[in-house]
Amino acid sequence: MTSGSPKITNLLTRVKRIIPPLLDTFHKGQAGRVGVFGGCQHYTGAPYYSSMSSMLFGSDQSHIFCEKEAANVIKSYSPDLIVHPFLREKDKAGPEDSVDKCFELIKPMMGRLHAIVIGPGLGRDEWMQEIMAKVIEYARKNDMPMVIDADGLWLIQQRPELVSGYHNVILTPNVIEFKRLCDKLDIKSDGPDACNQLAGKLNLLIIQKGQSDIISDGATAYACSVPGGLKRCGGQGDILTGILATFLAWRHAYLSKEWDTEGNMDAKECLFLAAFGASACTRWCSRLAFKECGRATQSTDLVRHVGKAYNALMEDEIPSVEEKIKD
């Protein structure tokens, strides 16, 4: 943890408060409807990892909005996925297609979602990026929680004003993406206070992924040092986005008081707790998969352990969690 920040187990105790109970009075979708925006001809796995992880962690539904040519491939991964082929790459668009028409297909769905993820498998095609800019603008206007990762961060690097000052978004850069964002804003990326500086300059929350994940809004910073696995396979960041989106959907339910909630945490505190909970559970998921598979670990192995990671850190009693983390 960073100096002066709470113990891991104290934070996890608070994280648990935003998790909705499993009640027979709840209806389908009340425990979270997540939207994942990404998936193109070359990248179909990333949106699957994000969407599937969100459901395996506990959201009721997850929708994938992807490029038309990626849709059937993504659908084939699981019948649990809801796939909308509403995105278009510029060189594959027909004469009837346009950025505005694509967004008009998406817009009616947005009101059904509690949290969205932008970036997994998105690519950098001009149209795909422009459509996402419209999605971000709409989400911000309607105060929707957002997670932005991967090539969604490429868009933010080009147009930081899309999210600057927005209180309901979390950026999740890896080391390369973090450096690009810092370079854009004239911040030394390898400085000891770089995450605080970047978060402060953008005036939003960042999870800087690394040996320990640094979570900062520019004023307060926590370090999540829950031990993870040692295999750095592609796709782990996508799993983080899905778990994080589920936490943000639960945060929405908590703040809406959809059950008799414990305590009276505000939106800002819940945002921090969602970020910390997602980081901790993703890292523990990686640890479980690595323990089983070792050097052969792939992100498909992590997906199989998402539910186990939830049970280990969110369902077990804190003393046993504390012992697990020490092991």
From Swiss-Prot:
Its main location: cytoplasm. It catalyses: (6S)-NADHX + ATP = ADP + phosphate + NADH + H(+); (6S)-NADPHX + ATP = ADP + phosphate + NADPH + H(+). Its EC number is 4.2.1.93. (6S)-NADPHX binds at residues 121, 174-180, 238. Its cofactor is Mg(2+). ATP binds at residues 209-213, 228-237. It comes from the Eukaryota. The keyword Phosphoprotein applies. The keyword rRNA-binding does not apply. One of its GO terms (molecular function) is ATP-dependent NAD(P)H-hydrate dehydratase activity. Keywords: ATP-binding, Cytoplasm, Lyase, NAD, NADP, Nucleotide-binding, Phosphoprotein. One of its GO terms (biological process) is nicotinamide nucleotide metabolic process. Residues 11-313 form the YjeF C-terminal domain. InterPro entries: Carbohydrate_kinase_pred_CS, CARKD, Ribokinase-like. GO terms for cellular component: cytosol. It is found in: Cytoplasm. PANTHER family: ATP-DEPENDENT (S)-NAD(P)H-HYDRATE DEHYDRATASE, ATP-DEPENDENT (S)-NAD(P)H-HYDRATE DEHYDRATASE FAMILY MEMBER. NCBIfam families: yjeF_cterm (TIGR00196). Belongs to the NnrD/CARKD family. HAMAP family: NADHX_dehydratase. Catalyzes the dehydration of the S-form of NAD(P)HX at the expense of ATP, which is converted to ADP. Together with NAD(P)HX epimerase, which catalyzes the epimerization of the S- and R-forms, the enzyme allows the repair of both epimers of NAD(P)HX, a damaged form of NAD(P)H that is a result of enzymatic or heat-dependent hydration. This is ATP-dependent (S)-NAD(P)H-hydrate dehydratase. The lineage of its organism: Eukaryota, Fungi, Dikarya, Ascomycota, Taphrinomycotina.
